[in-house]
């Protein structure tokens, strides 16, 4: 992986290259294995560049940067390869430079991967582009100044303009990620999908790539004439798998309860890898994905293990400091361009790789919900699967601007031949893919670089030759599994099954669903927004203290404070709130520069927010109930100034925490007494073994029930361990 930025003299606001290099080193979000600085010039031009490269599963740092006297330079980021028959051939920077050896040259059609490329030619012209879906993003100056980078803040640093762009910010609060090419910075734009950026003596040009993935002017629907394209896609996908695994030894493969990972498993089985596979699933014990994954492994006689996903096995309730520090670190690492819900945070530089089922969502429909009659409304389209301003925070003018951006995209797609049913899938491909998954790639690829067989160009082309209904029925998933590993067709999925519209051969298998009382299937630590009233109080104080943010031109500040007091956040609300927090962090300059792989990252100071009063808590311990292995505590707790919060409580002995419980049980008897909606009861247990250890031989021990992450106490009670 290699961060890079190229700029021509005159674009850097008069600052010399030496001064810029020091600033760029600080803006890079990684601790690189190798830094390469270079320049090239002619009588009328001079380019400068810097590349921050790390060792990957595929490349040494040196292999990702090429320069030669009189021949220019080339930097690659990601993974680039081409098909040689059925064998994948890796391309390094020198090989890519040789293919882009003259103005106007592009990579051959058999080149694949996930990558960003920049090539400086001997005549001073420059070309830059990324993979067709745009998963590895490129950025350029909004005014056409000769700057290109694969991290937006590097371009903003060269341009000496880090002012936020309200047009990009408001999307984070509306849906949790950006739409279109606006970035977090007003001076920087993202290169659109399937576009080529060129700089020559006459200035900047952005051209469309030839032979686009999405062609809507062809006959639609799967038929036997498309079998060769399907076979080509399967061959490309299996070549990608071979590229991403070692020559021998075990192969770790993720398996979930969904269809994407099952298609990848089918491809691996058909490629003869069965005896090398070691399946694993991320999730808490008993999560439907874990249950389904273990069942598939058992049916095939393959080993299976459970891994903790990001954040889900951590404490479900976070302290305010941990919450804000984590969000602020992600804001900085992600260039403030994606919401905080998915906890996209990198900690280490590593050369791991992973065969991923990502991109499979492009092969199927954005949503399985039926479309309304008539022309599709922009907001209704987004809401088929995702939030759109779920808390009603957008000012009318900002909402209208967002709807207008969506409407323009939709009308352009209709003009290209899109049906109404295509529009949600095109929205996903053209926006969520580069701007959400691309943001994940920009961080997590430095730890574990994914290989994505379902992103095979032939499969993507085939997906958009299907009808919208065929994608909704997940026809491609069915066809690939049927051809490669039909034994997998009848294994249960999590939350879903095969669509009966596939025909009588499609088995209906009851899906695996969450057990009663299971944790949320989507999200965990994020619900600290509901259970730690201190987080709400701190955020409300920060909003109240800074009324001059440009963000408030789009977001109703008073409505936001009201929601923090009175609205209990659900899944979509949380996505919106954590998107909004990223935008606030940017404007307030609160991003924590936690560099991926840097030894000093633990020493980065915590976020300093506006002062706030600790939330006032009332409540009562109604009773203590002893059982053979645990002692239970029950009662109610309520923060009157933050009635939507369902406060977390902590049981402590001599200051040591023995357990945390959330006052979220339904207690209708509390409502007549003014205790909110009554959903403020608590009941949690402490293992007797923990109480015995805490008692240190005493016959009884005093347990203090206190606010989690707060001062004071709710009750004290003596219990026998």
Residue ranges and their predicted role:
Residues 192, 228, 232, 236, ...:
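Generic recognition of stable, solvent-exposed alpha-helical segments in well-folded globular domains
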Residues 126-129, 135-139, 157, 313-316, ...:
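Short catalytic/ligand-binding loop motif for oxyanion handling, primarily in non-cytosolic enzymes
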């Amino acid at each position: 992986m290699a961060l890079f930025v190229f700029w021509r003299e005159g674009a850097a606001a008069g600052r010399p290259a030496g001064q810029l290099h020091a600033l760029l080193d600080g803006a890079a979000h990684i601790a690189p294995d190798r830094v390469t600085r270079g320049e090239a010039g002619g009588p009328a031009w001079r380019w400068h560049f810097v590349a921050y490269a790390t060792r990957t599963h595929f490349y040494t740092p040196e292999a990702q940067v090429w320069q030669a006297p009189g021949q220019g330079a080339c930097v690659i980021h990601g993974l680039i390869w081409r098909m040689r028959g059925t064998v994948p051939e890796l391309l390094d920077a020198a090989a890519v430079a040789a293919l882009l050896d003259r103005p106007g040259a592009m990579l051959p059609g058999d080149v694949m991967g996930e990558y960003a490329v920049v090539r400086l030619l001997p005549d001073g012209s420059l070309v830059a582009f990324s993979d067709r879906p745009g998963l590895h993003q490129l950025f350029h100056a909004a005014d056409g100044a000769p700057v290109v980078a694969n991290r937006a803040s590097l371009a903003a640093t060269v341009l000496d303009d880090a002012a936020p762009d309200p047009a990009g910010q408001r999307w984070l609060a509306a849906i949790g990620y950006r739409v279109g090419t606006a970035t977090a910075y007003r001076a920087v734009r993202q290169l659109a999908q399937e576009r080529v950026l060129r700089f020559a003596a006459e200035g900047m040009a952005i051209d469309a790539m030839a032979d686009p993935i999405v062609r809507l002017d062809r006959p639609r629907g799967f038929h036997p004439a498309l079998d060769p394209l399907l076979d080509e896609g399967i061959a490309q996908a299996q070549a990608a798998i071979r590229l991403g695994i070692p020559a021998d030894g075990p192969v770790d493969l993720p398996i979930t309860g969904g269809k994407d990972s099952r298609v990848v498993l089918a491809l691996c089985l058909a490629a003869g890898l069965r005896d090398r596979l070691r399946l694993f699933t991320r999730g808490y014990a008993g999560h439907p994905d874990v249950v389904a994954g273990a069942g598939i492994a058992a049916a095939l006689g393959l080993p299976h293990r459970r891994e903790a996903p990001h954040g889900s096995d951590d404490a479900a309730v976070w302290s305010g400091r941990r919450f804000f520090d984590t969000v602020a670190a992600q804001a900085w690492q992600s260039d403030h361009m994606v919401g905080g819900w998915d906890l996209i945070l990198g900690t280490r530089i590593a050369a791991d790789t992973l065969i991923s089922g990502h991109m499979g969502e492009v092969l199927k429909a954005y949503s399985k919900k039926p479309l309304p009659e008539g022309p599709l409304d922009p907001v209704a389209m987004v809401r088929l699967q995702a939030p759109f301003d779920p808390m009603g925070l957008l000012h009318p003018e900002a909402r209208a601007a967002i709807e207008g951006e969506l409407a323009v995209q939709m009308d352009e797609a209709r003009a290209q031949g899109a049906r109404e049913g295509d529009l949600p899938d095109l929205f996903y491909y053209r926006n969520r893919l580069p701007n959400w998954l691309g943001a994940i790639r920009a961080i997590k690829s430095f730890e574990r670089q994914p290989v994505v067989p379902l992103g095979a160009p032939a499969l993507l082309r085939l997906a958009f030759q299907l009808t919208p209904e065929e994608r909704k029925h997940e026809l491609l998933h069915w066809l690939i599994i049927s051809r490669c590993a039909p034994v997998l067709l009848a294994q249960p999925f999590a939350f879903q099954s095969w669509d009966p519209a596939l025909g009588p051969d499609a088995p209906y298998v009851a899906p695996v669903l969450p057990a009663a009382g299971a944790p949320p299937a989507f999200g965990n630590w994020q619900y600290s927004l509901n259970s730690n009233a201190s987080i709400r109080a701190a955020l409300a104080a920060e909003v109240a203290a800074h009324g001059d943010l440009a963000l408030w031109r789009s977001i109703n500040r008073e409505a936001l404070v009201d929601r923090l007091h009175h609205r209990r956040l659900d899944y979509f609300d949380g996505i919106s709130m954590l998107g909004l927090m990223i935008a606030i962090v940017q404007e307030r300059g609160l991003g924590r520069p936690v560099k991926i792989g840097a030894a000093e990252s633990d020493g980065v100071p915590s976020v300093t927010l506006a002062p706030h009063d600790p939330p006032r808590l009332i409540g009562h311990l109604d009773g203590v109930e002893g059982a053979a292995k645990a002692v239970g505590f029950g009662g109610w707790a309520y923060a009157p100034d933050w009635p939507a919060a369902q406060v977390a409580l902590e049981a402590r002995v001599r200051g040591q925490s023995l357990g945390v419980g959330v006052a979220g049980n339904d207690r209708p008897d509390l409502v007549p007494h003014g205790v909110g909606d009554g959903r403020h009861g608590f009941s949690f247990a402490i293992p007797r073994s923990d109480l015995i250890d805490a008692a240190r031989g005493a016959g009884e021990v005093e347990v203090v029930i206190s606010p989690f992450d707060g001062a004071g106490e709710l009750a004290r009670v003596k219990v026998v361990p």
